[in-house]
Structure formats: structure tokens, C-alpha cells
Amino acid sequence: MSFQEVWEKEPMKKPRIQKVTVNFGVGEAGDRLTIGAKVIEELTGQSPVRTLAKQTNPAFGIRKKLPIGLKVTLRGKNAEEFLGNAFSAFKTCGKVLYASSFDQVGNFSFGVPEHIDFPGQKYDPSIGIYGMDICVTFEKSGYRVKSRKVKRSHIPKKHLVTKDEAIEYIQAKFDTEVVRE
């Protein structure tokens, strides 16, 4: 029995996207960071959070607690819309998604090297080109028992999202091919 048939019979077993995290590693504070914030806000529709350097690196001119990156967490419909655009940008730059990108509980990450690959984006010399890492986290219905405050419990292994389920979901929902080595 395929995953699609199981999901139709038992909707609680169908995985869903919990969140999509978009990371911009600019590497320096200042103008590039503020321009990057405008770019990521235009792509996602949300204002980003600045990430701080964890340690000092004099070779790159980075001090501890200096803002050097940006991140945005998307949930619900916004996450699915952004992920659809991200997959089209990913295909545009000639990349493929490998099964080795998925972990054992179905989460995966991929990178888009240029923000201008997204639909509707044009190159502007004053902005430059920014790349980003996109991390997708999956869950199933009932995962709230793991994170709630009262009567917290663990998720049984049979209810965790598997790597194969996540691959099947991505292929069906976003019409994206996942290459198995």
C-alpha cells in the first residue's frame, strides 16, 4: 500500500510542513545586511531577525555578538507558497534535490545560490546577489503533545515522519523530483 492510500484512509498519518526557515548568511554588518533584510522581506513577506556572531574572527573582521546574518521562519500557507517559489528557483539554477538531503525524521535543507532565480526578481547592481539556505521541518497531527506545557509526552516511533514519507509528500505536493543515489 502506497503512502497516498494510507494518507487517504488515515488523515492523522499525513505529514505536513511545520515550518520553513530561511537563512541569509551575509557575513558582515552594515549596508549589505540592511539590503539583505530588504531582499528577504520582499521574498518572504515577513521582516527578518538578525543573527549574531558566536565568536570573534579577526581574519574576517567579525566580532562576537556582531549581526552577520538574517533568518525568517514561515509557517502555514506562507511557508507552502514560499517553498513553491523556492523549488522553482532551485530548478531554474539547474540543481536537483537528493535523498541524502533528508534526515531520518523527514526534515531537509537545500540552498538557492542567487535570489534573482526566484520568480519576479530582477538583477539590480546596487543590491547585488544574495544566496540563502532553506530548511524545511515536517510534523504529523498530534505532535503538539511533545511541546505543550501540561501533560507533555513523547511521540511514538510509528507516528514520526519518515524519510520516505517526506520524499513522497514533496514529490506529490510540489512536483519536484528527488534523486535517490
Swiss-Prot record:
Key words, A-Z: Ribonucleoprotein, Ribosomal protein, RNA-binding, rRNA-binding, tRNA-binding
GO molecular function: rRNA binding; structural constituent of ribosome; tRNA binding
Record flagged with keyword Ubl conjugation: no
Domain of life where this protein originates: Archaea
GO cellular component, one term: ribosome
Pfam families: Ribosomal_L5, Ribosomal_L5_C
Keyword Cell cycle: no
InterPro entries xref list: Ribosomal_uL5, Ribosomal_uL5_arc, Ribosomal_uL5_C, Ribosomal_uL5_CS, Ribosomal_uL5_dom_sf, Ribosomal_uL5_N
Gene Ontology biological process terms in this record: translation
Gene3D superfamilies in alphabetical order: 3.30.1440.10
NCBIfam families found in the cross-reference section: PRK04219.1
HAMAP family: Ribosomal_uL5_A (MF_01333_A)
Family: Belongs to the universal ribosomal protein uL5 family.
Oligomeric and partner information: Part of the 50S ribosomal subunit; contacts the 5S rRNA and probably tRNA. Forms a bridge to the 30S subunit in the 70S ribosome.
Reported function: This is one of the proteins that bind and probably mediate the attachment of the 5S RNA into the large ribosomal subunit, where it forms part of the central protuberance. In the 70S ribosome it contacts protein S13 of the 30S subunit (bridge B1b), connecting the 2 subunits; this bridge is implicated in subunit movement. May contact the P site tRNA; the 5S rRNA and some of its associated proteins might help stabilize positioning of ribosome-bound tRNAs.
Protein name per its UniProtKB record: Large ribosomal subunit protein uL5
